[in-house]
Amino acid sequence: MKKIFVLLLCCVLVVACSDDKRYAPKEGRVSVFEAKVPILAKGSVQVATSEKVSSWSQPFYNIQNKQPNQSVSQNEKIWRERIGKPIDFNRLLATPIVIKEAIYTLDGTHKLTKTNMLTGERIWEKEIAQNKNGLSLSYTNDKLFTLSTDGLLTAFDEEGNQLWQKDFAVATRAPIIADRNILYLITTHNQFIVLNTKNGNELWRYQTTLPQTLLTNMAPAAKSKGVVVVPFSTGEVIGFDADSGLLLWIQMMVGNRPQDLTEVPQIAAAPVIEGDVVYLTGHANFSGAYSLKTGETKWTVNFGSRLTPILSGNTLFMLTTQNELVALDKKTGKAFWLKVYKTEDHPWQSISLVNSEIVLSDGEHLLYINPVDGSKIRVENKELSTLPIAIDGHLITVDESAKLTVY
């Protein structure tokens, strides 16, 4: 009887401890990364002060894809509403756009909805087209743009009136980016198309080599200081003069290691621009920092990621394809620290910075991590399928069942 009691007690202890260890850093092994990039002997992580932002106009916040250190002031749910059809293999949910306390959402069946951020009141909704799957939303100069996975591009005003529509009849997997009077579109056939926001007329385009096999979604372009940086599924990243379309530089985001299924040349992480530097992350175990104007290499590291990294203060935070969460000195590419965070049933889907804490999402939970040393802080049960967005202190999430929640 005593043996049975001890056995039952051990089982209880194991169950009680399992949740704490679910996202614990893996210990007892040396990362390939650690052997290739020396950990800094001196120096520490510094992140920018968290800020309340009042709008979110692009899939990754702005046209530089540089997400802020978001400020959230409360954690209690205010309201929750379903905005359309749930996600499945063929349906995607676009990252919401938030403008003037209104949330714009695009569901997997290409239905566009405008909702009051504070009350959850449905302002209007539009069925854009039948038999279309929504991909992305973007906003500029009082105009909203929706893109389907088969190249249907539609422009609306803030009242939901359709301004124009163009059907490119080509597969698209990269979110569209809108900047003032210009739209940037990337197709799966590796065409980069530049359009006027007024009427959708084409300004110029570029065609690179034949497409590679797509294992994930493609990354959007980024623009700053007259240069637009475009990632292609071939592993090429090209810098163009934004006005003329003149090719300025080319970088291949492919490392030195032999390719396997985890090292395809496709680029899923968006370019991130800060100042005169663009940070590029490939899927094929290769990332680096480059001159925005010339493409000159500043530093490279032999690991990759499928998630857009976070740049804040003196640090670039990245989750590698091997689940290595790493904090890099943005000037040298050397590491302040590295931790390996495992997941159970779902891969990590996003990385963000909220209230000066790194936040990883696997679709069902949010894992909060200390940016100074990479240690786990806590886990919250929050389901989401897009980036968490914080506007005026409110956290906004969309889950796989197409439920929009504001905290």
Predicted regions and their residues:
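Bacterial signal peptide processing site
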Residues: 18-21
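Structural signature of WD-repeat beta-propellers
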Residues: 107-108, 148-149, 187-188, 232-233, ...
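Blade/loop signatures of beta-propeller domains
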Residues: 27-36, 43-78
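Short loop/turn segments that connect beta-strands within beta-propeller blades
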Residues: 116-120, 157-161, 196-200, 242-245, ...
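Sec-dependent bacterial lipoprotein signal peptides
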Residues: 1-15
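Extracytoplasmic beta-rich repeat domains
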Residues: 78-97, 122-138, 163-179, 202-225, ...
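WD40 beta-propeller blade core
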Residues: 113, 154, 193, 238, ...
